[in-house]
């Protein structure tokens, strides 16, 4: 079960726009917000500022940011390949179900790949993280910097154009998959590695308490195979035993990468 400790939500400025954003967060399902600091212990915080929303746990602060999606988009616009897109084989007009949304890095790349007529559904088991990412996507265009680097600016604009195609849902992926009709999406994607990265990375430390470190279940994979029209894709550590345990064929490539992609064709 994910940690449901209260999160202290606060404004950096008494600004009408920020108050509206605060009200939006308070309406999100499943979140345990408080506006009163605890005298017994330090609570994790979500701070709404004129420069974005920040999650803080201890000494570490995390803003919503496209992160590696920005670098990957620069590479894609420059004509280079992307292993995630090679694994998922997403096409214009496809529907992608990202069953482990995390911070939405892969979902942003997927949303760009499926184009204007495509759709990305992102599932996140933590209600706080789901709200944080949805807010970031809602305000993505505001993040675009005045970049002198034309390639970087083009990547920002491409991701901002793709971000509205992502629908964030709070929920446990296996239960959500059970409710979907058979063959209702093109690709189902799992990236449980995000949870392990949160545990090890200092930059991701504010997200650690909301991460689910449980392994993927066979039932979730069976449901994903029922729901997908084309394929189910798993990202894991290179040489991970999870591929064999869950029945995925590992794709070749990425000789120097620390990760591999596995695929089940349906």
What are these regions (language model features)?
Residues 217-265:
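Conserved Class I SAM-dependent methyltransferase catalytic core
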Residues 92-102, 121:
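Conserved class I S-adenosyl-L-methionine
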Residues 103-117:
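Conserved SAM-binding loop of SAM-dependent methyltransferases across substrates and taxa
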């Amino acid at each position: 079960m994910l940690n449901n400790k209260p999160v202290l939500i606060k404004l950096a400025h008494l600004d009408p726009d920020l108050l509206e954003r605060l009200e939006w967060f308070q309406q999100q399902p499943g979140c345990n917000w408080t506006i009163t600091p605890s005298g017994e212990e330090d609570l994790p915080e979500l701070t709404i500022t004129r420069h974005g929303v920040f999650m803080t746990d201890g000494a570490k602060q995390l803003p919503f940011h496209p992160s590696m999606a920005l670098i990957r988009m620069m590479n894609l616009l420059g004509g280079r390949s992307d292993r995630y897109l090679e694994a998922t084989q997403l096409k214009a007009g496809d529907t992608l179900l990202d069953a482990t949304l995390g911070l939405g890095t892969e979902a942003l790349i997927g949303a760009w790949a499926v184009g204007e007529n495509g759709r990305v559904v992102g599932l996140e088991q933590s209600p706080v993280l789901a709200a944080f990412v949805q807010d970031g996507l809602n305000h993505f265009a505001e993040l675009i910097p005045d970049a002198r680097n034309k390639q970087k600016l083009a990547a920002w604009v491409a991701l901002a154009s793709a971000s509205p195609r992502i629908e964030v849902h709070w929920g446990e992926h296996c239960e959500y998959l059970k409710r979907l009709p058979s063959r209702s999406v093109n690709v189902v994607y799992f990236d449980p590695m995000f949870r392990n990265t949160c545990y090890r990375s200092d930059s991701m430390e504010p997200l650690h308490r909301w991460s689910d470190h449980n392994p993927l279940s066979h039932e979730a994979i069976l449901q994903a195979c029922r729901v997908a029209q084309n394929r189910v894709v798993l990202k894991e550590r290179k040489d991970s035993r999870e591929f064999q345990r869950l029945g995925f064929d590992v794709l070749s490539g990425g000789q120097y990468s620390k990760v591999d992609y596995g695929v089940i064709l349906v």
